């Protein structure tokens, strides 16, 4: 585990302990989840990647990304630009996120939403659903296979999708063994923070049959999108390059081509 992930995991375990003690059991909302993976499948077409557009105020590596930060307005802009799904950062200490951003963004659109959060306890899956999330993120660099399987099983129980994130060959093999059907390849090296799109090109050859492959990080231009589509990616998660634009809708349309 990288230094930054170790730091996040440590404070997240403390945070979850407090939240869990205050609310040990969480009832899911009556509304069924919006199908996250299904929306990506519908949006993907030959020569066109489905887009998971991310609502992210800041990051540890880049600091503040967008000062004019209005989650509902950003969600509507992404939807108008052609995004298939949303990803919303809720972690506060490292990303200046907040749980309220997820509910606010989701209520403004019809798109399925991923809660971009660092999960260290299956309790957080139920919490995510109660906040309106339709999908969760399982970062294999952060959890062992036992915990990953528990997170995925809890998501399935609640009718949610699980995006299983990998960074290298060993993690892709683990994702396959876990039966992941939605796999995200993070092009960012979590130790150096350098981004290399060839990570997706390399790991795509190992993706299990039937899994929907999402490429994440470092996607800025239509040329990047075309390159990643050629290697077998079916969807992309893009945040920073769109969040920095004055006209988010136009930037989203331009990226999708």
UniProtKB/Swiss-Prot annotation:
Keywords in alphabetical order = Amino-acid biosynthesis, Aromatic amino acid biosynthesis, Decarboxylase, Lyase, Tryptophan biosynthesis
GO annotation (BP), single: L-tryptophan biosynthetic process
SUPFAM superfamilies in the cross-refs: Ribulose-phoshate binding barrel
A molecular function annotated in GO for this UniProt entry is:
indole-3-glycerol-phosphate synthase activity
- Catalytic activity annotated for this protein? 1-(2-carboxyphenylamino)-1-deoxy-D-ribulose 5-phosphate + H(+) = (1S,2R)-1-C-(indol-3-yl)glycerol 3-phosphate + CO2 + H2O
Q: In which pathway does it act?
A: Amino-acid biosynthesis; L-tryptophan biosynthesis; L-tryptophan from chorismate: step 4/5
The keyword Amino-acid biosynthesis is annotated on this UniProt entry: yes
PROSITE patterns linked: IGPS (PS00614)
Looking up InterPro entries in the UniProt record yields: Aldolase_TIM, Indole-3-glycerol_P_synth, Indole-3-glycerol_P_synth_dom, Indole-3-GlycerolPSynthase_CS, RibuloseP-bd_barrel
Q: Under which EC number(s) is this enzyme classified?
A: 4.1.1.48
Enzyme superclass (EC): lyase
**So what family is this one in?**
Belongs to the TrpC family.
- Which named protein is this? Indole-3-glycerol phosphate synthase
- Source species of the chain: Phenylobacterium zucineum (strain HLK1)
Taxon lineage:
Bacteria, Pseudomonadati, Pseudomonadota, Alphaproteobacteria, Caulobacterales
